[in-house]
C-alpha cells in the first residue's frame, strides 16, 4: 500500500468527523427555530467601507460614531478569552470584526459565537474604529449566524491550490482565491465594456438561434441533438454568422451578438467545447474598417478596465495604444521560415513538399490554399506574439469571405493574433449569391471526401443573399481568449467559470 492511501483515508475520516459535528450544531439551531434566518439586512460592503474610511484616524472615526451593517463568510477567527477578532469576507473583499463578550447580549459570545465554524455566514452590526495597528474594524454590538456551513473551508483557508478541484468546485475556488474572483470580475467588465462600445458605435444587440437545423458560419464539428416534438436532428450552433447576416439583409445595418458557441472538438489550454464570442456585422464597410474598429475596441477596453493600454502577459508586454502589426499570410510564412519563398508557396508540388517537410499530412482533398494555411499555422502562428493582423487568406479556407478584386485566389480577410494565438477573425462578407452557392458546394464535396469540419449547404441562406446583402464587413472575437490576456491567465479554464470536465468516476 502506498504512503498516500493511509493519508487519504485519514483525511476522509477527519472530514466525516467534522461534518458530523457541524450537522449536530445545525440540529440544535433547527430545534431553536433559527436555522436559516432571512431577516438580516446588510447595508454596507467591505470595499466601500475601506475606500471611504481607511484614510481616517481612529479619533475621527470615534467622533463620527459611524454605525455599519455587514454580512459575509467567516474566514478566520482568533479567540482571546473574552474577545475575538474575525475576518469577514463579502463580495467586495474583507473586513475585520472585533467581538467582545461584554458588548453582545448575554450568552451569545460563549454559547453561540464560540461554537460557530469557519465558513459560516454571519451578519454583524457595530461601530467603525481602528485597531492599534491601524486596521479598519467593526466593534460589534450585534452578531448573528445566517447560514451554517456543513463543510469546512479548503485547507483551513490557506488557499485552494489543486487545479482539478478549482475547476470542478469553482465555488470553493472563488471563496479561497482572490485572483480567481478578480479574473471573473474582469470578465464581467469586458462583457459590459464591449456592449457599451458597440452601442456607442450604433450597433444593435440581437439574439439568434442556438439550436439550428443547419450549422454554419465556421468550419468545425458540431454537437448533434434531437428535437422530439419535430422529430428532427438539430445542431448546437458553431457560430451565429449566417443568422446575423440575414438580419443585415432585413435592414438592420449594424448588429452584434455576444454568443455561446459549441464545437465538438478537443479540450486544451486554448480550447473549450463551449465558449463565448462577440460577432458584429456592419453594412457599407469592408475589412479595413474592421481593422480600425478592432484596434479601437482593444484600446478602449484596456484603458477603461485596466487603467492603461499596456498589458503585461507573462514575460510579454502588449501596448494596445499602438497600431497592430500587419502581414500577409505568405509574408508571415517567409518571415518565420526564411528558406521559403513566395514562388514556392504558389506552386502546388513545392507547397506539398514544404508541408510534408514540416510533418503536415496533406490530404488529397486539399487545394493549394488549404496547404498554404496549414504551412502558416505550423511555421508562423506561434511567433505572432505582439498584436498582428494576418491578411490575404486563400478563398479555399474562407468560404464566407469576399474575394479580392485584384486576386480572386485570396479574400479580403484577416485574423489577428496576440501572444501566439488567434483572438479574432474578420472579413468583407461575400454577398454574391452565386459565388456563395458554389463555395457551399465545394464545402459539401470536401465533407464527402472526409472533412468533417467542412460546412453544410444552407439553401435558405442563399435565398437570403438573393434578396440582396449590402456591402458588409463582419468580425468575431473570442471573449475567453481576450479575458486570458487581460488577466494574465495561461489556460482557458481559468477564465471560464465552469469549464468542460470529464465526469468523476
Curated annotation (Swiss-Prot):
Coiled coil: none annotated. It is an enzyme of class 6 (ligase). Its EC number is 6.1.1.6. SUPFAM superfamilies: Class II aaRS and biotin synthetases, Nucleic acid-binding proteins. Mg(2+) 1 binds at residues 415, 422. Its main location: cytoplasm. Its cofactor is Mg(2+). The keyword Ligase applies. CDD domains: LysRS_core, LysRS_N. The keyword RNA-binding does not apply. It comes from the Bacteria. GO terms for molecular function: ATP binding; lysine-tRNA ligase activity; magnesium ion binding; tRNA binding. Keywords: Aminoacyl-tRNA synthetase, ATP-binding, Cytoplasm, Ligase, Magnesium, Metal-binding, Nucleotide-binding, Protein biosynthesis. GO terms for cellular component: cytoplasm; cytosol. Belongs to the class-II aminoacyl-tRNA synthetase family. Homodimer. This is Lysine--tRNA ligase. It comes from Yersinia pestis. The lineage of its organism: Bacteria, Pseudomonadati, Pseudomonadota, Gammaproteobacteria, Enterobacterales.
Amino acid at each position: 500500500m502506498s504512503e498516500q492511501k493511509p493519508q487519504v483515508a485519514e483525511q476522509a475520516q477527519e472530514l466525516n468527523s467534522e461534518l458530523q459535528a457541524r450537522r449536530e450544531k445545525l440540529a440544535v439551531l433547527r430545534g431553536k427555530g433559527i436555522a436559516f434566518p432571512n431577516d438580516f439586512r446588510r447595508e454596507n460592503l467591505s470595499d466601500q467601507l475601506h475606500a471611504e474610511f481607511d484614510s481616517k484616524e481612529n479619533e475621527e472615526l470615534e467622533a463620527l460614531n459611524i454605525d455599519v451593517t455587514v454580512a459575509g463568510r467567516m474566514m478566520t477567527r482568533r479567540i482571546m478569552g473574552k474577545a475575538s477578532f474575525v475576518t469577514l469576507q463579502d463580495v467586495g473583499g474583507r473586513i475585520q470584526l472585533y467581538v467582545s463578550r461584554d458588548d453582545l447580549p448575554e450568552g451569545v459570545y460563549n454559547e453561540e459565537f464560540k461554537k460557530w465554524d469557519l465558513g459560516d455566514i454571519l451578519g454583524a452590526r457595530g461601530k467603525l474604529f481602528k485597531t492599534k495597528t491601524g486596521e479598519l474594524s467593526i466593534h460589534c454590538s450585534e452578531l448573528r449566524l445566517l447560514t451554517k456551513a456543513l463543510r469546512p473551508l479548503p485547507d483551513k483557508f490557506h488557499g485552494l491550490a489543486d487545479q482539478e478541484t478549482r475547476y470542478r468546485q469553482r465555488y470553493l475556488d472563488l471563496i479561497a482565491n482572490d485572483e480567481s474572483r478578480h479574473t471573473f470580475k474582469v470578465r464581467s467588465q469586458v462583457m459590459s465594456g464591449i456592449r457599451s462600445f458597440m452601442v456607442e458605435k450604433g450597433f444593435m444587440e440581437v439574439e439568434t438561434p442556438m439550436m439550428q437545423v443547419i450549422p454554419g458560419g465556421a468550419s468545425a464539428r458540431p454537437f448533434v441533438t434531437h428535437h422530439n416534438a419535430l422529430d428532427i436532428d438539430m445542431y448546437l450552433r458553431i457560430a451565429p454568422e449566417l443568422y446575423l447576416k440575414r438580419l443585415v439583409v432585413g435592414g438592420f445595418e449594424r448588429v452584434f451578438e455576444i454568443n455561446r458557441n459549441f464545437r465538438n472538438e478537443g479540450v486544451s489550454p486554448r480550447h473549450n467545447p463551449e465558449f463565448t464570442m462577440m460577432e458584429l456585422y456592419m453594412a457599407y464597410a469592408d475589412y479595413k474598417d474592421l481593422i480600425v474598429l478592432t484596434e479601437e475596441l482593444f484600446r478602449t477596453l484596456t484603458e477603461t478596465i485596466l487603467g492603461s493600454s499596456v498589458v503585461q502577459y507573462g514575460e510579454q508586454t502588449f501596448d494596445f495604444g499602438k497600431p497592430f502589426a500587419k502581414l500577409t499570410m505568405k509574408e508571415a510564412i517567409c518571415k518565420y521560415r526564411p528558406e521559403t519563398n513566395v514562388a514556392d508557396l504558389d506552386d502546388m508540388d513545392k507547397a506539398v513538399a514544404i508541408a510534408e517537410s514540416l510533418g503536415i499530412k496533406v490530404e488529397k482533398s486539399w487545394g493549394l490554399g488549404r496547404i498554404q494555411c496549414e504551412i502558416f499555422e505550423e511555421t508562423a502562428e506561434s511567433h505572432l506574439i505582439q498584436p498582428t493582423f494576418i491578411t490575404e487568406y486563400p478563398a479555399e479556407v474562407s468560404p464566407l469571405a469576399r474575394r479580392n478584386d485584384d486576386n480572386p485566389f485570396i479574400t479580403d480577410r484577416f485574423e489577428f493574433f496576440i501572444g501566439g494565438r488567434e483572438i479574432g477573425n474578420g472579413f468583407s462578407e461575400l454577398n454574391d449569391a452565386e459565388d456563395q452557392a458554389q463555395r457551399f458546394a465545394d464545402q459539401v464535396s470536401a465533407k464527402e471526401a472526409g472533412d468533417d469540419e467542412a460546412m453544410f449547404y444552407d439553401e435558405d441562406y442563399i435565398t437570403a443573399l438573393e434578396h440582396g446583402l449590402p456591402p458588409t464587413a463582419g468580425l468575431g472575437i473570442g471573449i475567453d481568449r481576450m479575458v486570458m490576456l487581460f488577466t494574465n491567465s495561461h489556460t482557458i479554464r481559468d477564465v471560464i467559470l465552469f469549464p468542460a470536465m470529464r465526469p468523476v468516476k
